[in-house]
Swiss-Prot record:
It holds the Pfam family Ribosomal_S5_C. It comes from Francisella tularensis subsp. tularensis (strain SCHU S4 / Schu 4). The lineage of its organism: Bacteria, Pseudomonadati, Pseudomonadota, Gammaproteobacteria, Thiotrichales. Part of the 30S ribosomal subunit. Contacts proteins S4 and S8. NCBIfam families: rpsE_bact (TIGR01021). This is Small ribosomal subunit protein uS5.
Amino acid sequence: MSNEVKKNEELIEKLVSVKRHSKTVKGGRIMSFAALTVVGDGKGRIGVGRGKSREVPAAIQKAMENAKKNMVSVNLNNDTLWYPVMSNHGASKVFMQPASAGTGIIAGGAMRSVFEAVGVHNVLAKTYGSTNPANVVRATIAGLAKIKSPDEIAEKRGLSVEEIQG
């Protein structure tokens, strides 16, 4: 469970977790490995991927390729969020709120990898319920994906940004 950081084609690749699986057959146990990775460009694009193979490096490679195929765009306010947001996936619930410059990433485990890959540098975050890395990563990305900028909200409501921000 290391956090490997690699810059490849301007993408930040993070390994979130590696788990060992076993299948019991007549002749014994067959081991395989499952990897969970996060890929981002540091500018608001993020993807999550899973890969499974008999060897760890092959599982990680498959997960990285899968993450690159499943990238989504996130709306950020420079290096933080626009407003507090709560999201869940399965039994995992995550709460994220913007932080002032210099605060850093105050988040645990799998959430930290997502924030580093997407390009968020100042955020306060907390996980409630299950801390299963797969569910926490998906909940974090879902929460980030539903954030809208004041410009988008104003356009949707047919108002000016000043009227919305009061």
